[in-house]
Amino acid sequence: MTIMNGFELHYLSFVYAQEFSSKNNNLGGQMKHIIALASKIAFTLALLYVILDRVYHASFLSVMFIALFLGFVSYLSGDMLVLPRTNNITASLADFGLSFVILWVFVLTQTRNDFSPFGAALLSAACLTVFEYFFHRYLLKNVLDENFRNELSARDNTLQYQTEAADELFPETKEKHKE
């Protein structure tokens, strides 16, 4: 029996969840969101564990709390609100800003070590942004409904500013006709 590291274990669970959801197309949309959220939290935990716990020696309980909070907040705001209305790069940049602020506050308040919270938050947010880019591609392909995305884009792009143009700069008035 071999021992797997966190990345191998997460990859296998992600592949199994993707295979399970593709075989069972009768699963509701809620199950797809639960699988996506669980995968996001698991990978966020694995990534933050490597960076914050192994590199910066933060406690595992703090890392787990940060990963759970960040996973829920970024899934609801970045993946469900920003991504369907914009594109992948914009949503990834929004996730970078959100994760950087959340990580900076949590690392500053939850850890008691002699490292720079700014550097730890910046490195963690940058690594999470790379993951978010590929996670957004997965969401767009497998989780978000095509009708939902089309409905949002049609509703958001309804403002069309147009200008009227006239043949004359000065309109004819009754006084000009009398002369």
Swiss-Prot record:
Keywords: Cell membrane, Membrane, Transmembrane, Transmembrane helix. Pfam families: DUF2512 (PF10710). The keyword Glycoprotein does not apply. The chain crosses the membrane at residues 33-53, 63-83, 89-109, 115-135. It is found in: Cell membrane. It is a multi-pass membrane protein. The keyword Membrane applies. GO terms for cellular component: plasma membrane. This is Uncharacterized membrane protein YndM. It comes from Bacillus subtilis (strain 168). The gene is yndM.
